[in-house]
Amino acid sequence: MALSASLLITLCCLGTAHAQDRPAHDPTVVAPPAPTPTRYSIDASLDPATHTVEGTLRLHWVNESAAPANDLWLHLYLNAFASDDTVFMRESRGQLRGVQQAGRGGIDITALDTASGVNLLPGARTDLIRGDATQMRVLLPAPIATGDAIDLLIRFRSRLPPVFARSGYVRDFHMVAQWFPKLARREPDGTWASFPYHGMGEFYSDFASYDLALSVPEGWVVGATGAQTAEEHRDGRAIRHFHADRVHDAAWVAWPHFRERFLTHEGVQVRILFPPGHEDAIARHERALREGLTRFGRAFGPYPYPTLTVVLPPRGADGAAGMEYPTLIVSAGPWLNVPGVHSPVPDDVTAHELAHEWFYGLVASNEVAWPMLDEGITQWATSRLLADVYGDARSAVSLPGLTLDGFEAQRLFSMRGRPIPAAGLPAYAFDDSTYGRSVYLRTALVLETTRRTYGAARFDRALGLYARAQRFRHPTPEDLFSSFDGVFGAAFSERVLRPALLRGETADARLLRMSSVSNHAGGYVTDIEAQRDGTVALPLWIELRTASGVRRRLPWAPGLPRFRASFTAREQFVSALLDPDRHDLLDRNALDGVISEHPAPPRAVLARLVALFHALVAAVGA
C-alpha cells in the first residue's frame, strides 16, 4: 500500500540504485508448487443504489497443518467500519492517509452450513474483542484431521462504507475489497493466524484458487483479481466470471465510466482502467508498468500470472487509491502532465503497487506481524526502479535546475519529528506519524545502505535469492536474514540487519577535528579524528582535500569505534569529508561529517546543503 499521493509518497517511493540484468533463463527461480487445495467460489451481486453486495461463498478447505482443527477462524474485515468502537476505528481515529470516514459499513453472515447441511452459525462467535467483530470463530461438530477437508456454504451481505480506507464507494464508483468471509491462515503447527483489522498494517492469508461470478448493472465496467473466463447477460445485468490460481485474496472494482487500455509485456496482458478525459496521462503509468514487469521480474523472478489489472480511480476516491491486491492494483492521480517537469506521482504509486505483486503477493509475509517485509522491501524496490527510469539525481523531483536524489530525500524525511520505533515491530506498534517513516523509509534506507556499502552485485543476489526461495510461501524476518547471511557471511545479519531493522540502531558517525600544519621541512603534518555514535558499524571512508583539489582517502574499519590518523605529506589538507560517496544513509546528521579550514566549503558539502534545501522546498510546496 502506498502512503499517500502527496509529500510522503513524493519522498518515499524514490531511489538511487540500478537493477542488474539477469539472463532470461534464471536457474535460481523456484518451480511453482502444485495448485493449492483450498478453493473459494463466490457468486456476488452489486446493488449500486444501496452500495451492498449479496454473496454466496462455497469454500473447500483442507487441513494441511500438523494438528486436527477443532474450529475455523474467519476474517470479517468490513466490520471494521461498523462503529467507532472497533479496533480499526480506535487505532486510526476514523481516518487513513488523511481521508476521513463518512459513514458505516459491515458484513452480515446469514447462513453458514456444512455440505451435509449442518448449521454452524449457533456455534460461531464474533464477540472476541470488545466492540470489534472483524473475526469469527466457528466451532466444528467434529475435528478435521490433518489431510482431511471440509466444504462450507456461506451466504453473506456486505455493506460498503463511503470509501476512506481501501474498500467502499463514492457516488457510483465501487471498490469491493476485504468484502467476503475469508479464512485466516492456519500455520503449520496448527495455530490460526487471526487478528482484528488494525489501524496500521494490512492482511495475511493463505494461497487458494478463486472463482468469481460478479453481477453488475448492464454497461458497467468490472476489473477483478484473476483472468476473465466468461460473461453472461440477463435481466439487465452483466455477470462476469474470473478465475485465479495460487493467490491469497480477491478484490474487484465496478464503475460505469471507466475507459480501458490494454498492453502486453513480458507475456502479461495488462488492462488499465481509468477515468475519461485522462488518456494523455496514461503513458507514464504504462512506462512504469513495462519497466516494473521487466526489472522486478529479472530481480525477483518473473510475474507468474497471465493478467494484471491496473485501476486509476476517479477524483474523490482517494481512499481507494494506492492499494495492492493479487493481480489487481489501484494507483492514483494527480492527472496534470507538465512537459519538462518530472514529479514521481502518479507513476511512483503504480510502481509501488506493482512491486507489491512480489512482496506481499508472491512472497506472502504476515503484513501485520512484520510489515517491513512487504512495505519496506517494496519501498526499496520502487526506489530502485524509479532511479533506473529517471536517473539517480532525478528520481525524486526534477525541475529545470532542481533535482533531488530519492534516497537522500527519504533519509531527510525519516529523521523529522520524534524518534521512530524499529522497523521490525508489528504494525500495531506504530501510529500514523511513525509507520511510514519507520516501516517504509527506515527499511528502504537500511537496504540501500547495505547495497551501497557492501556492493550492488552481492546485495542483488541476496535479495533475489530471498524472493525466489520464498515464492508462494510465508516467510519471516529470519528467512530474509538467512538469505543475506548465505551471500555475505554467517554473521552479517547479526552485525548489520538485525540491529538496524529489529532494534532501530543507527550508523551515526562524525568528524571531531582535523589539522594540517607545516613541519617547517617542506611538508605538512595532518591529524584527523572521528567517532562513531551509532552501533551499526559500517566500513567508512574519510576524504581529505587540498585547496587545489588534491584528494586523499583514508579507510575506517567497522570494528573501530574511534578513528585517529596522523601522517606527513607534501600537501596541506584544508577540509575533510566523512563518507564522501554517501553510502551511509543511517547517519541521522550528515552535516557533522564535514570539517573545513578553507573559506569556500567543499563542493560535496554544498551538494548536501542543496539537497536539504530541495527537501524543504518540496515540503513547503506539497
Outline where the language-model segments fall.
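Zinc-dependent metallopeptidase catalytic helix centered on the HExxH motif
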Residues: 332-403, 463
